[in-house]
Amino acid sequence: MAKVNIKPLEDKILVQANEAETTTASGLVIPDTAKEKPQEGTVVAVGPGRWDDDGAKRIPLDVSEGDTVIYSKYGGTEIKYNGEEYLILSARDVLAVVSK
């Protein structure tokens, strides 16, 4: 995973989606049109967190760079940067962090 010059703002997270499987367990090849949208990816960059209701301090995020996360199927904004595809998610779109 290469370093990216994108810094998310507030409670946003930059994720590179893990590739969806291209073959089934029985060996059938899945065409691109039939693939499920991936819901798992690696966190590439993390914003500083959002401000609390008083605006006095930032609330840090529960994820950090390098974490593998599971996120909402239709959450986030897809972007392309330097030929790579990324997803910018809000922290509330992240459903879980995968333990290693």
Curated annotation (Swiss-Prot):
It comes from the Bacteria. Disulfide bonds: none annotated. Gene3D superfamilies: GroES chaperonin. GO terms for cellular component: cytoplasm. SUPFAM superfamilies: GroES-like (SSF50129). The keyword Hydrolase does not apply. One of its GO terms (molecular function) is protein folding chaperone. It is found in: Cytoplasm. Keywords: Chaperone, Cytoplasm, Stress response. The keyword Chaperone applies. InterPro entries: Chaperonin_GroES, Chaperonin_GroES_sf, Chaprnonin_Cpn10_CS, GroES-like_sf. GO terms for biological process: chaperone cofactor-dependent protein refolding. Belongs to the GroES chaperonin family. Heptamer of 7 subunits arranged in a ring. Interacts with the chaperonin GroEL. Together with the chaperonin GroEL, plays an essential role in assisting protein folding. The GroEL-GroES system forms a nano-cage that allows encapsulation of the non-native substrate proteins and provides a physical environment optimized to promote and accelerate protein folding. GroES binds to the apical surface of the GroEL ring, thereby capping the opening of the GroEL channel. This is Co-chaperonin GroES. It comes from Mycolicibacterium paratuberculosis (strain ATCC BAA-968 / K-10) (Mycobacterium paratuberculosis). The lineage of its organism: Bacteria, Bacillati, Actinomycetota, Actinomycetes, Mycobacteriales.
